[in-house]
A protein has these predicted regions:
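Short helix-initiation/N-cap motifs at beta->coil->alpha
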Residues: 116-125
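Structured C-terminal subdomain patch of bacterial secreted/periplasmic proteins
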Residues: 25-34, 131, 135-197
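Second-shell loop/turn segments in exported
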Residues: 20-25, 36-50, 87-93, 174-181
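A local structural motif
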Residues: 107-117
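Basic- and aromatic-lined ligand-binding clefts that recognize polyanionic substrates
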Residues: 47-107
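Proline-aspartate-enriched helix->loop->beta-strand connector
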Residues: 1, 10, 125-138
Length: 197
């Protein structure tokens, strides 16, 4: 508990991306800010700035690649970032206040759940089918990525979704999207490699 540590003079650094409430509208700038903070705390400001520069270059390279391929498309592909329950059950979608939002935007994809005024929310099969994303990115915390990808077919009505019909499904470890950390840049590159070639 933070107050107990503070009362005995032990400093505590809380990672806002992992706290309840977290960062309201996360983005790549939050990743860079956290690296700067850790650089200060551990007296490694130069290394932090070097890492930030590398991450900024990688994001800029992806955005340039996406801008180049966007001119070849009539309209951007739509996408949903989901956290399904393997074996059936609740499916969650990532909305406007998640790291998935800036990640999809940088990847040149339009989040079909951008109107969700939450980080993550439970969605019904009907709602998912009605939004008909071109691309599905399914996140998982553990287990077999193929099983997670296959779990999409357990959701009633998904056989009519464009992403399923066109086999545009990517299973990714959750930490490649959530929370806002340097791994979100790895996830961005993976999404673009999969869907924007």
């Amino acid at each position: 508990d933070a107050s107990a540590l503070s009362s005995v003079g032990i400093p505590l650094l809380e990672e806002p991306a992992l706290c309840p409430g977290g960062i309201e509208d996360p983005g790549f700038d939050d990743v860079y800010d956290q690296l700067r903070l850790y650089g200060e705390v551990f007296d490694r400001e130069d290394e932090a700035e070097e890492n930030i520069g590398e991450l900024e270059d990688r994001v800029a390279a992806v955005e340039e690649q996406v801008d180049g391929s966007a001119s070849d498309q009539e309209e951007p592909l739509t996408a949903a970032v989901l956290y399904p329950t393997v074996g059936g059950g609740t499916t969650y979608a990532y909305g406007a206040h998640s790291m998935a939002a800036p990640q999809l935007e940088a990847a040149g994809l339009e989040n079909v759940f951008a109107d969700l005024d939450e980080r993550v929310a439970e969605v019904t099969p009907e709602e998912l089918a009605g939004r008909d994303p071109d691309v599905l990115i399914v996140l998982y915390s553990e287990g077999d990525p193929q099983a997670v990808e296959d779990s999409i077919s357990d959701i009633p009505g998904t056989d009519g979704i464009s992403a399923v019909a066109e086999d545009r499904i990517l299973a990714m470890p959750m930490n490649m999207t959530e929370p806002a950390t340097p791994q979100a840049v790895d996830g961005l590159e993976r999404i673009v490699e999969e869907f924007q070639q």
